Amino acid sequence: MTDTLASLAYLAGKPTAQAKIKAKPEHFQVREDLGFEFTGSGEHLMVRIRKTGENTSFVANELAKACGVKSKDVSWAGLKDRHAVTEQWLSVHLPKAETPDFSAFLAQYPSIEILTTARHNKKLRPGDLVGNDFVVTLSEVSDVDDVLKRLETVAKLGVPNYFGNQRFGNNGNNLQEAKRWGRDNVRSRNQNQRSLYLSAARSWIFNLIVSARLEQSLFDKVLLGDILFKGDEQLLVSAENHADLQSQYDAGDLVISGALAGDNALPTQDDALALEQVFLDAEPDLMALIRGNRMRHDRRAIALKPANLSWQVDGNNIILTFSLDAGSFATSIIRELVQEIAFEREF
């Protein structure tokens, strides 16, 4: 599989250590956190599943059959990796109060467990989660000491908040199709396909901007015209507040943001605008797709700082525990630590 991110910069240089990722399903564990309580009643049955070696779409389709409903009646907040052990909620539109008998479904699929159920008044929609908790094992690590040094840096500075390879499809196909659609002015009623390509387009331009800041030693430097996050507030950096905002950033109170391109003007100014505009201009096909679909500009933090990061060493294995907000990629953490060893998975 092609690494679409291969050309992008690293925070501390490309890792020298190698390791296997997801050598076993239990080496990549994910627990979804929706961040809200269910109402306890309503037309939607909420089903907490634990799946091993299965993808979310497959489980949702099979759960729909078990409940006697159509696939479109089962929804989720986020897609979870197949090569892993993952816990997440699925919602099933079942207006009747009875909970189906899942015994035949569970007997057919021993790789799927139903942990609990509840009732809610709304179905789950993509993005209806606050984040995920991870337990990741790096196995057969070739240089444990180097990875431990890098972990100290990650704990202090975070990592580039890149969108991972998953966003760009197998071998970057979604990104290539996004460019083709923009270049050829493709119009499609396939909303899911259009959403995938638009997402790939904006994500790639964002990644280029973050990589450039790293290459220019501006990853932790506040620029004139930057947009900074302070909680839910956005601050514009001017000549008058530049020094003060850099101090607040250094103290950990502010976050530098990068562009998620839209058809409206960038809100950045001065030096920050000049840096970002280069990459919008460099991708005319992607921008044609974005503008043609009237996407509005948005912002995203350029640094990803995992919460509750800890690690332990077990021989030549390193076990990582951390939490990420929704929309962030665990692969961005791993990318800064090791080069992945290619191997044939048996699951």
UniProtKB/Swiss-Prot annotation:
The active site is at D81 (nucleophile). The keyword Cytoplasm does not apply. PROSITE patterns: TRUD, UPF0024. It catalyses: uridine(13) in tRNA = pseudouridine(13) in tRNA. GO terms for biological process: tRNA pseudouridine synthesis. Pfam families: TruD. Its EC number is 5.4.99.27. It comes from the Bacteria. SUPFAM superfamilies: Pseudouridine synthase. GO terms for molecular function: RNA binding; tRNA pseudouridine(13) synthase activity. One of its GO terms (cellular component) is cytosol. Residues 158-304 form the TRUD domain. CDD domains: PseudoU_synth_EcTruD. Keywords: Isomerase, tRNA processing. InterPro entries: PsdUridine_synth_cat_dom_sf, PsdUridine_synth_TruD, PsdUridine_synth_TruD_CS, PsdUridine_synth_TruD_insert, TruD_catalytic, TruD_insert_sf, TruD_pseudoU_synthase. PANTHER family: TRNA PSEUDOURIDINE SYNTHASE D (PTHR47811:SF1). Responsible for synthesis of pseudouridine from uracil-13 in transfer RNAs. Belongs to the pseudouridine synthase TruD family. This is tRNA pseudouridine synthase D.
